[in-house]
């Protein structure tokens, strides 16, 4: 990696930026909109599902955190896969993560269109997607501080809104003003806590995982963070509190306020529940917050996709032109290329306005599975390398190596679940073809480089 290129990135993200980005990073469409599909599959037991998936996500982020604290680089786990596993692993994980972020960008833009239609049903989803596409990408071309400030305030809004919703919902329950249908017994009174059995919960796990996509954002910010040794461990350890407050507590209140079997699909259950309680003002405000959350996640994934493309270019796995960084510290070409591909979302929403979000969500989950498996496997190789060198790490992961194998087994189980679900099967079937395309592209890249390159130092260890 060119030190000059790396040095041109600005350390414009302060401790408050990193902490709030990490704290608010998982509050997005997966919680507010994706939850409707998981409720349909599992009922109240999705609360347990989010707890299980959140625990796996926490274990894996500790694995990534251990590597990032040792080497705070822009390529994140793609860099680590390249260095500790081999060149193709870095090539595959980097491009897969870039595609993942582009897909998440598309999903968030699709969701933004649905939220706008809550107020103005006549506005097509593609029009809303195009508007926010232009706005966010324009801002991201200015300076990394603008990204940090936007995410900081977006996260403040999301966090305060979630806490207010929990508080207001708890007040309604405690005072009995939420109506006769509101009761904690909603968690078990309607066909039990597992209305569709354990099978229902298992089938919902693939949808639940979508909510945790993008949780790796802290790793991408490492190269532009000040004092990464201090800020990054704090950001990682916050994940467990995010899960308990933003998912478990929120869903507990939601299910208590309204019977789960009356929550309609297509929109946000949160908005629908408060609207049904004659709290139209609260529902309108909540829809604004949910819209803010979707814009926030789109902003973050736009940032991630451009920085991953920059890292790939610095590794030689993408055209060198994408490694150029302007005087403001922005990888302009990487931002523009990522944006150009993301704009396909506008076309997708124009052709499939009602199915775009669901299709993109399943593709995102498949890409998440690949990336999380790569992170856990790369971490195994990272720890073995550190042990051979006789070095200890500053921020060791939990339960190594058991947690690595547990995370990988869980993610492979998600693929099995998706393959058994007709609506999700196509995403799983695309994975072998996608990896084959990456293998062909990698071989093409190697043949294009005529001069023989030195053997990768750590590849020789393999």
Regions found by a protein language model. Give the residues of each.
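Membrane-interface "cap" regions at the ends of multi-pass membrane proteins
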Residues: 1-36, 41-45, 57-62, 71-74, ...
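Extracellular loop-to-transmembrane helix junctions
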Residues: 10, 33-128, 132, 239-242, ...
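C-terminal membrane-solvent junction of multi-pass transporters and transport-like membrane proteins
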Residues: 153, 321-332, 369-422, 452, ...
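Membrane-interface loop-to-helix entry segments
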Residues: 113, 126-182, 213, 236-240, ...
């Amino acid at each position: 990696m060119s030190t000059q290129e790396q040095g041109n990135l600005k350390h414009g993200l302060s401790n408050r930026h990193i902490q709030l980005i990490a704290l608010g990073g998982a509050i997005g469409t997966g919680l507010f909109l994706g939850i409707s599909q998981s409720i349909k599959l599992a009922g109240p037991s999705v609360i347990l599902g989010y707890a299980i998936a959140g625990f796996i996500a926490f274990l894996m982020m500790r694995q990534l955190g251990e590597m990032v604290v040792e080497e705070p680089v822009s390529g994140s786990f793609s860099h680590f896969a390249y260095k500790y596993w081999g060149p193709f692993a870095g090539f595959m994980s980097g491009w897969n993560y870039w595609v993942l972020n582009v897909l998440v960008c598309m999903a968030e833009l699709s969701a933004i269109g649905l939220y706008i239609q809550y107020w103005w049903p006549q506005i097509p989803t593609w029009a809303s997607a195009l508007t926010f596409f232009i706005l966010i990408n324009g801002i991201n071309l200015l300076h990394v501080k603008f990204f940090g400030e936007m995410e900081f305030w977006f996260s403040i809004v999301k966090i305060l809104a979630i806490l207010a919703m929990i508080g207001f919902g708890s007040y309604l329950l405690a005072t009995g003003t939420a109506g006769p249908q509101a009761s904690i017994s909603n968690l078990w009174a309607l066909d039990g806590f597992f209305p569709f059995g354990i099978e229902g919960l298992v089938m919902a796990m693939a949808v639940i995982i979508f909510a945790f996509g993008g949780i790796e954002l802290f790793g991408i910010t490492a190269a532009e963070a000040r004092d990464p040794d201090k800020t990054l461990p704090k950001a990682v350890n916050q994940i467990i509190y995010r899960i308990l407050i933003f998912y478990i507590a929120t869903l507990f209140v939601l299910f208590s306020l309204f019977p789960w079997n009356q929550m309609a699909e297509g929109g946000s259950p949160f908005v629908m529940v408060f609207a049904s309680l004659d709290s139209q003002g609260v529902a309108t405000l909540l829809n604004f917050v949910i819209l803010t959350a979707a814009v926030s996640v789109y902003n973050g994934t736009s940032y991630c996709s451009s920085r991953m493309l920059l890292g790939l270019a610095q590794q030689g796995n993408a055209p060198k032109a994408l490694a150029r960084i302007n005087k403001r510290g922005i990888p302009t070409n990487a931002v523009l290329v990522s944006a150009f591909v993301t704009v396909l979302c506008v076309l997708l929403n124009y052709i499939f306005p009602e199915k775009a979000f669901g299709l993109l969500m399943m593709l995102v989950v498949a890409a998440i599975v690949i990336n999380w498996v790569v992170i856990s496997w790369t971490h195994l190789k990272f720890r073995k390398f550190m042990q051979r060198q006789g070095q200890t790490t500053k921020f060791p992961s939990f339960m190594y190596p058991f947690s690595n194998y547990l995370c990988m087994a869980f993610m492979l189980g998600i693929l099995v679940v998706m393959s058994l679900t007709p609506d999700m099967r196509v995403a799983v079937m695309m994975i072998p073809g996608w990896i084959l395309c990456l293998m062909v592209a990698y071989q093409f890249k190697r043949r294009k480089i005529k001069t023989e390159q030195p053997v990768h130092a750590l590849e020789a260890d393999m």
